């Protein structure tokens, strides 16, 4: 299972088989980034949990089934160890534009910055992607990337969709993904379980 946009890969039993964490010094710098905390919240996925700077009940409802729940922390005092990703969530995509510009200017040469959704901007270690993680996952297999198919709906799927033998874009995908991968076939909507119906 590939998680955190490729920063972690686990087998079916949950054992970690690949890891690519953000350097701690970069994480601590990311905590200091200026942003409007009335419009944006900062989160981290780390080896010891999911952390956030403020309580956001609407996020909690998406994690009822898994039991994976955030812990509210003061990031001025929080550690930066074992960080899969630092991510910023806003209600309005426009509120992330200035932050994205800042991140790309100050961290673009040493991190991977990508949207996983229209309102979620994520920062991982340099060269982290689902495509890279998939290539690591296949290292000891008798088949490669070109023997795989993949489905995606976000900008964080670009490398994976481009590197596999056949990539499909969901109908409800981020328009920026469709623009980046115009050559890929578009199929139905996630809500219609199109992947299961098609394959």
Language-model features and meaning:
Residues 4, 89, 170, 187:
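Conserved residues at the C-terminal ends of beta-strands
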Residues 29, 33, 37-151, 155-160, ...:
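Conserved acidic, metal-coordinating active-site core of Asp-based
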Residues 163, 171-199:
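Asp-based, Mg2+/Mn2+-dependent phosphohydrolase catalytic module
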Residues 1-25:
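Alpha-helical substrate-recognition element adjacent to the catalytic core
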């Amino acid at each position: 299972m590939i998680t955190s946009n490729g920063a972690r890969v686990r087998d079916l039993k949950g054992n970690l088989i690949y890891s690519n964490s953000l350097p701690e010094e970069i994480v601590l710098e990311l905590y200091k980034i200026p942003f409007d905390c009335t419009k944006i919240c900062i989160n981290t996925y780390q080896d010891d949990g999911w952390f956030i700077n403020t309580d956001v009940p609407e996020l909690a409802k998406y994690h009822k089934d898994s039991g994976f729940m955030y812990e509210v922390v003061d990031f001025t005092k929080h550690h930066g160890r074992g960080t899969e990703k630092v991510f910023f969530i806003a209600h309005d995509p426009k509120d992330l534009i200035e932050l994205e510009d800042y991140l790309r200017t100050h961290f673009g040469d040493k991190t991977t910055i990508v949207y996983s959704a229209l309102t979620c901007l994520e920062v991982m270690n340099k060269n982290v992607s689902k495509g890279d993680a998939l290539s690591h996952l296949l290292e000891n297999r008798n088949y490669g990337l070109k023997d795989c198919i993949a489905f995606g709906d976000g900008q964080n799927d670009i490398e994976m969709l481009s590197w596999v033998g056949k990539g499909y874009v969901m109908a409800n995908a981020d328009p920026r993904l469709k623009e980046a991968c115009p050559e890929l076939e578009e199929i139905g909507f996630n809500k219609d379980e199109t992947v299961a119906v098609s394959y």
